[in-house]
Amino acid sequence: MRHRKSGRQLNRNSSHRQAMFRNMASSLVRHEIIKTTLPKAKELRRVVEPLITMAKQDSVANRRLAFARTRDKEVVGKLFNELGPRYEERPGGYTRIMKCGFRTGDNAPMAYIELVGRPEVEEVEEVAEEAAE
């Protein structure tokens, strides 16, 4: 029986799953939107949301915990310098999962997972153009 077993196996052993979600969490924090399969996106939400909640309180201990979970100094810096202050007033629910059809080849359900309230691409391009002038 499968009572009280949380999380999906995703046809991987535990070390592979841990490494995969560490990489995916780093990519999501870095790019703020990634495309993946729907089950992976739903599991990734369980990894990323506690990291952002941790980033709301900037302390050495929290930075070390975040580094232990992501193994990427750049990502830890972005978490605590940008994302923590951005979501200071939001009590959870930092990610959004949007279904985007099925993958060609194996028909796997695909989804975008993004950080809520991320800056739009057009705004970033306009700011870059203004800075160039």
From Swiss-Prot:
Pfam families given in the database record: Ribosomal_L17 (PF01196)
KW Nucleus (keyword) present: no
Similarity comment text for this entry: Belongs to the bacterial ribosomal protein bL17 family.
InterPro entries, alphabetized: Ribosomal_bL17, Ribosomal_bL17_CS, Ribosomal_bL17_sf
Protein name, as recorded: Large ribosomal subunit protein bL17
Any GO molecular function: structural constituent of ribosome
Oligomeric and partner information: Part of the 50S ribosomal subunit. Contacts protein L32.
GO terms of biological process kind: translation
Protein keywords: Ribonucleoprotein, Ribosomal protein
GO CC terms: cytosolic large ribosomal subunit
NCBIfam families xrefs: L17 (TIGR00059)
Residues in coiled coil: none
